[in-house]
A protein has these predicted regions:
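Residues forming the flavin
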Residues: 1-212
Length: 212
């Protein structure tokens, strides 16, 4: 039930399909609240949290699926199975940045974001090569991509002007309940005036505290 899965449920409905529901393995949706409201609730599409597909049925083509609830270890719970007669199953399995060009250039990748490891100017491990947007890490909104591209352009300008130094380096690490943090490197002798961090939490937290 990430944003793409939610949006596709609405799109299928608008195109005339009868959507039986959206299943999410986790006990919460990974999509934006507005997409849950506008894509599912407004169209009466059920959201099955803590559920996964355990069986598919059909001869020559898909005819049905079985959903089951999962426990805290994400294992199906016997006796919770639900069967649906369907002819289409869409799988929304997340996004991974396309980085074949970065690999070809020998850029160091961050295993947490599946994209390049960058500093506060969005420069990669190869001097003069910068990364931003969904080629760096997956963004929820295009507005964030545009803003990050602006910061990367400013960093590129600093590099071309020769005011960027890379002598002193520290690494930013994701702590408890944080999946990743970008940028992953800070060159402390050449920081921009403002350093913005992007991160994703591992699960929804209400009333949480951010510690740097």
């Amino acid at each position: 039930s990430g944003d793409i899965g939610l949006i596709m449920a609405r799109r299928m409905t608008l195109e005339g399909a009868k959507v039986s529901g959206v299943a999410e393995l986790m006990p919460y949706s990974n999509g934006l609240p507005r997409n849950i409201k506008q894509c599912l609730e407004d169209f009466g599409i059920p959201l099955f949290l803590s559920h996964t597909v355990t069986k598919i049925f059909g001869h020559d083509r898909l005819e049905g699926i079985e959903l089951a609830q999962v426990d805290e270890n994400r294992r199906p719970i016997a006796g919770t199975e639900k069967n649906f007669a369907v002819d289409t199953l869409l799988l929304s399995c997340g996004l991974i940045p396309e980085n074949h060009l970065g690999d070809a250039c020998g850029i160091v990748m961050d295993p947490h974001i599946k994209g390049p490891l960058v500093d506060a100017d969005y420069m990669t491990s190869v001097p003069g090569i910068f990364a931003c947007g969904n080629g760096l890490h997956v963004h929820d909104l295009a507005d964030f991509v545009v803003h990050q591209a602006t910061l990367a352009a400013q960093g590129c300008t600093r590099y071309l002007q020769g005011v960027k130094s890379m002598q002193k380096e520290i690494h930013a690490q994701a702590g408890q309940n944080v999946g990743y943090v970008v940028p992953g490197i800070l060159h402390t002798d050449s920081l921009p005036k403002i350093v913005e961090f992007y991160f994703r939490v591992r699960k929804p937290i209400r009333g949480g505290t951010i510690i740097l």
